[in-house]
């Protein structure tokens, strides 16, 4: 299981495809909401089975999908290959080592449904900053800080444990401490919010 891997972030196990795809019927819309644009060089951090990676690759110049779970990366690789997408590299590794794993500098780092499980958020934010171009962006999609019982799909509670969830304010504080500046806070219905940060030009 992914959760048994050294360095795996708590509460970020890849869910079954059925409810995950029901939760995210329009991944391209989510990406547009947080500012992923055509022609960018994008890193999909903690990419899982590639549900968002595929949509990123359809518009990006180049994508690097990074996950600690090699099995999930193979699922993602197969997903993109079936769609005829060839502009993605798949890299197994620890998210904290992002600066060593992703080509630099990049336009955008995308992280969905994983930041709540990161033990050292400052360290991760600093690693992201190192990989971005000046004025590059870091987009985080997080579960709202609501009781798990209130975030149901197909009639069952979904998502991380209630105690792991972060408010937008907590997320913003953690990432700004790593040297990135908030540029956008958006709703990502039905149960998420998105926060976007920029690396300063200097």
Outline where the language-model segments fall.
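A short SAM/SAH-binding and catalytic strip from SAM-dependent methyltransferases
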Residues: 107-121
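C-terminal alpha-helical "lid/dimerization" subdomain adjacent to the S-adenosyl-L-methionine
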Residues: 4-7, 11-15, 19-20, 137-195
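A short acidic, Gly/Pro-enriched loop at the edge of an enzyme's catalytic core
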Residues: 100-108
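Conserved alpha-helix/loop element of class I SAM-dependent methyltransferases that forms part
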Residues: 21-40
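A short glycine-rich, Lys/Arg-flanked "PGG" loop and its adjoining helix->strand segment in the class I
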Residues: 122-137
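Class I SAM-dependent methyltransferase SAM/SAH-binding core
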Residues: 43, 49-97
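C-terminal lobe and adjacent flexible extensions of AdoMet/dcAdoMet transferase-like proteins
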Residues: 195-202
């Amino acid at each position: 299981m992914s959760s048994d891997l050294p360095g795996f972030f708590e509460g970020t196990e890849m869910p079954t495809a059925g409810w995950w795809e029901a939760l995210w019927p329009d991944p391209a819309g989510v990406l547009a909401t947080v500012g992923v644009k055509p022609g960018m060089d994008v890193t999909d951090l903690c990419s899982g089975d590639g549900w968002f990676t595929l949509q990123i690759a359809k518009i990006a110049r180049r994508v690097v999908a990074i996950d600690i779970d090699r099995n999930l990366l193979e699922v993602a690789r197969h997903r993109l290959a079936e769609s005829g997408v060839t502009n993605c590299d798949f890299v197994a590794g620890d998210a904290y080592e992002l600066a060593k794993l992703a080509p630099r500098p990049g336009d955008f780092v995308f992280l969905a449904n994983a930041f709540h499980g990161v033990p050292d958020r400052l360290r991760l934010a600093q690693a992201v900053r190192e990989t971005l171009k000046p004025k590059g962006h870091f987009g985080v999609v997080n579960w709202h800080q609501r009781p798990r019982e209130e975030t149901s799909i197909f009639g069952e509670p979904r998502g991380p444990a209630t105690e792991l969830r972060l408010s937008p304010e907590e997320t913003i504080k953690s990432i700004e401490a790593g040297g990135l500046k908030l540029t956008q806070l958006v709703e990502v219905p039905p149960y998420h919010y998105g926060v976007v940060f920029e690396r300063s030009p200097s």
